[in-house]
UniProtKB/Swiss-Prot annotation:
Pfam families: Ribosomal_L5, Ribosomal_L5_C. Keywords: Ribonucleoprotein, Ribosomal protein, RNA-binding, rRNA-binding, tRNA-binding. Part of the 50S ribosomal subunit; part of the 5S rRNA/L5/L18/L25 subcomplex. Contacts the 5S rRNA and the P site tRNA. Forms a bridge to the 30S subunit in the 70S ribosome. GO terms for cellular component: ribonucleoprotein complex; ribosome. This is Large ribosomal subunit protein uL5. One of its GO terms (molecular function) is tRNA binding. It comes from Alcanivorax borkumensis (strain ATCC 700651 / DSM 11573 / NCIMB 13689 / SK2). The gene is rplE.
């Protein structure tokens, strides 16, 4: 069992149950999955760009990413239906907690000019989304072997019913939220 999962079960969940005034420990919000998404727009012109994105995503997440294809052709972006334009990874259970620990303790502190995560990044249903401008904040990525700096979207899906519950959950996991 991951250290973070054990901390959640032993410390965070009872504290949140008390703080949120919930009757049952099963009502306490928890993180169900973390999704990483990387759009690779230049993959339409350069096939090697997708390979670099896939290797970076594999190193960061520890599992093979799913290649996402264009749903329809868009002449303005010079893409055709079915062409690869990005990749995504959905992490659950053990890998999710390991990634969360690396994100909070290593990656977020390495972001340049970081002043805290935007508290408006919640979607109204207890899920949190954030974007990274460069993948080199993760220690698994070797800066010398990176062909291009790519950003990615990170979505944390929780069982929280409101943004306030999700905010309390992420603060308990030491997320540096502003305000």
């Amino acid at each position: 069992m991951s250290d973070l999962k054990k901390i959640y079960q032993d410390e965070i969940a009872p504290k949140l149950k008390e703080e949120l005034g919930l009757g049952n420990i099963m009502e306490v919000p928890k993180i169900t999955k973390i999704t990483l998404n990387m759009g690779v727009g230049e993959a339409s012109a350069d096939r090697k760009a997708m390979e670099g994105a896939l290797s970076d995503m594999t190193a960061i997440s520890g599992q093979k990413p799913l290649v996402t294809n264009a749903r329809k052709s868009v002449a303005g972006f010079k893409i055709r239906e079915g062409w690869p334009i990005g990749c995504k990874v959905t992490m659950r259970n053990q890998r999710m907690y390991e990634f969360l620990e690396r994100l909070v303790s290593v990656a977020i502190p390495r972001i340049r000019d970081f002043r805290g995560l935007n508290p408006k990044s919640f979607d109204g249903r207890g899920n949190f989304s954030m974007g990274l401008r460069e993948q080199i904040v993760f220690p698994e990525i070797d800066f010398d072997k990176v062909d291009k700096l790519r950003g990615m979207d990170i979505t944390i899906t929780t069982t929280a019913k409101t943004d306030d519950e999700a905010r309390a959950l992420l603060r308990a996991f030491n997320f540096p939220l502003k305000g």
